[in-house]
Amino acid sequence: MTTGYESVPTSEPSDNLAPRAELWQRHLLEKKEGDQSISVSAFNISSMHNELSGLSEKSRQRVEAVWAAFSEASCSERKLALQGILNNCSSSLLSFASSTLDSLVRLDFLSLLPVEISFRILSFLDARSLCQAAQVSKHWKELADDDVIWHRMCEQHINRKCEKCGWGLPLLERNTLYAAKASIQKRYERLTKRGVDQAHESSPVKKAKLDDYPTSSNEETISSVKPPSPNSDSKFFLPFKTRPWKEVYAERCRVECNWRHGRCRQVVLSGHSDGVMCLQLVRNILASGSYDATIRLWNLATFQQVALLEGHSSGVTCLQFDQCKLISGSMDKTIRIWNYRTSECISILHGHTDSVLCLTFDSTLLVSGSADCTVKLWHFSGGKRITLRGHTGPVNSVRIIRDRGLVLSGSDDSTIKIWSLETNTCLHTFSAHIGPVQSLALADSRLFSCSLDGTIKQWDIEKKKCVHTLFGHIEGVWEIAADHLRLISGAHDGVVKVWEACECVHTLKNHSEPVTSVALGDCEVVSGSEDGKIYLWLFNNAPNESPVSTQSVPISSLNGQRSNSSVQRALSSVPNYSSSLSNISTRNLNIPPSNANNDDVSIQS
């Protein structure tokens, strides 16, 4: 018996047809490990064999003769024969031929190609197309859902704007990426050695590598996924022992959709008795400083206050905290360093002759700005203190760009100065604002500034010029915060604005007093006001409708008392948190030594 386009012996069972050189590619059976499925063509051959055996001897011989003659004909003869057959077909037969051809001409190319080539093809699809591809078949689903594909998708979108689609997804969890990436590379190499070399030894196509795909230039923090176990195995790929990258992508995509459509819920934190001057947000821990001379720490998972730091004799104007210490500046002219887990003040730094208005620090350096018009550099090691002079008005904001060796400062004199950490000299002065510069924000290589002239400006530090001016607030802008995806601003008009690509996309209104401080997270906007209230706009797990009702969370006075155990539990999510609280000392808090007050080097710009 002959079937299809080439000769096939009738004595050979149709469900055990071996691949033959004279068969077309679509006739080859898909033999996969642990998979008993067969191709559509193989099923048709088996069906025809069964129908043929049910015919009379004369009819069977007539059909076999037609098949044999067609198989022995040349290509041009076959075309001519088909044209003649089709011309003699009724409408019902033509309809049957059309439906039959529709399934025969389809080719599952991903099943025929080497797996790494399939990955390469799928890597050009967007997220929606990948989800649609996963619905084609089980084999396509395994390929389209694999970590290799979705890890690349996460690298392309998370914490950055995709150049192709313009979407960027929030970072959310901040754990290292390199271990997960190395695990995926190992899986990929194991796959190519195990599957491709055995099933496609004759394939001349060069194997693609994971390193060929575009990857992130910043491989610090992308996913909360732990690497899969190297000892686990599965039918096709190593199984997921933790959250798959597709799930990670989907979670962040939901949050980004909430950002885009303005879907959020609102929470109000009440605890300060006077205006909120400064905020800092690290994951689910929020620190706030106020005119009431206190610093409060909040757990945003429960919206509860977990620590109260008291010691300043006047309003707290600025603060920053890391894994184990919090540094604050005050209108009492001092800088205090706290072990915020025990609410203990570790050190007090004196040096400024007027209110300390701003500060920032990294692993080796503390920079502060004051109403005395100076910028001070406090070195954690060696005790050296340097004073930078050049501003003619109070210094309201300072920032460190460590990889460039620069310090930035913004002042009431309407200027922004760039200082060299190597020479301690002023390299350049920006002077485009016509009002006091209140806040500076850095995102990637972009510098933003806001002023009481009601504008926000974006600067090119390399070219030393203003590249964008953002208008939207009707009164002075007090503070801004930025990340890789967006910028937020709080102003004297009592509103908070969310900006993307230099355009205002949302305006958040609920404050009854001027907004004096803001903080930006991956899925939240935080703002503080002169009325002492802190507003949170939460874009994760947002309801379908917007706006939503406000949830107020009043906090009773702690009177400076809070058990260490509750603080430790609340702060356990802070990155690199050590459970050994008893070992915290002045030395490992990494603070300027007490003799820093005696080694003041004054630099005039």
From Swiss-Prot:
Residue windows of the WD repeats: 271-299, 311-339, 350-379, 390-420, 432-460, 472-500, 510-538
Record has tRNA processing as a keyword: no
CDD domains registered for this protein in UniProt: F-box_SpPof1-like (cd22147), WD40 (cd00200)
Location in or out of the cell: Nucleus
Superkingdom of this protein's organism: Eukaryota
PROSITE patterns to which the protein is assigned, alphabetical: FBOX, WD_REPEATS_1, WD_REPEATS_2, WD_REPEATS_REGION
Biased composition (Basic and acidic residues): 195-212
Function, in words: Probably recognizes and binds to some phosphorylated proteins and promotes their ubiquitination and degradation. Required for the inactivation of zip1 via ubiquitination.
Protein name per Swiss-Prot or TrEMBL: F-box/WD repeat-containing protein pof1
Native source species: Schizosaccharomyces pombe (strain 972 / ATCC 24843)
